[in-house]
């Protein structure tokens, strides 16, 4: 099996990323106070040293992972990695995502492979340690509209459901009917949803099918025993509310440097979860109120509720990273630009809760270009990098390379300029007022020449319209709606025609190269 040929596009050149993200990777001085470890191998090695001094409850972690996997035929690599987590010499590199139908966009695959490859790279340098890639299921999120669809070959497939609350607890009713409408979708994907009661159960099966051979461990944080490890943070957030003040201070600093804020904290950064309910908790007077319900607690009552039912308290986006770092021996979190933006807001929140802040590592960025598309680009003499140009500039590139001789009136314009300058000089000797007239006539002549050039170019564009349409069509596949392909298309767009796609991506991509790595079939 041959891997892809890879063409690298600079992140800044692509015009797809925020200034904060670019400046973070460039190690700009004013960004450095927002993180502890820079995302490179040296930073990860320092994180290993620091993380080893902040232990977690590994016994509970291993027990709960085994329980979560009990109904699944676990691969040998995954089983080994779960067992390895019992050792203090084992560390995790984690990514997470919502429980999107059909895994959602391709970048979920890239995030997960980033974890796998970083773990393998560290193992070659630290033979005495073990490194486990972990996928965190965001099963407690409650935004159904963000997870109920995916795209295959540019078409959106949507699962309509009226269920509410934590999405991991949703039943899978109706998903099979959606998948039946998709041609050539793998049978195992349909079976994963058909054989599962909940969306969390189905998502674990899907991720296990895709990544079991790489040893990826899937964890569900919606777990009472794991939440019990987080109760100290839950109680402190309820009664002292320290996160909001320190995070707002960080946010003001970020805004002073001209960046946008990704996340704003609440006074209490917790939801109350029960059955199909997930609503924010707010302190109103002396009581803790669950918004949009008639549920409320006194201080004593909510303290008892935390002790008896920690699973009913769900961290929001501010505290979820702390929850992950509390129950996992993380040395790094792998995320996209948006995730990294809000992780950079959290350093002081981690500090106020005395929780380890892992390295914040960017995921790999990529896209897939078919063999047919590569051939068409080659015939048009267009590079992959040039697909990231504006539509106007890309058209100019196609036209200029499709014609035998460049259309340019530069030489003729020079001749006209010289001729009129001579005329102007002669006119000045006859009558000074005629000189400005001659210069005005020169401007008119040059403008007419420019109009002629535009008409010639338009005629040339029409002549090469088929080539232009072909190239722009490829561009629309690589950058649908102007965004990276990985942000829309599902992995199943490509798995349908190439069952080895994930292995090829694994073989071809480098997690420490901060570029867009476009993968071309050879």
Curated annotation (Swiss-Prot):
Domain of life per record: Bacteria
Uppermost EC category: ligase
Coiled coil: 436-469
GO molecular function, one term: ligase activity
Entry keyword annotation includes Coiled coil: yes
Record keywords: Coiled coil, Ligase
Enzyme Commission code(s) on record: 6.-.-.-
Family annotation (HAMAP family): BshC
Protein family according to the UniProt entry: Belongs to the BshC family.
Protein name: Putative cysteine ligase BshC
Organism lineage string: Bacteria, Pseudomonadati, Bacteroidota, Cytophagia, Cytophagales
Gene from which the chain derives: bshC
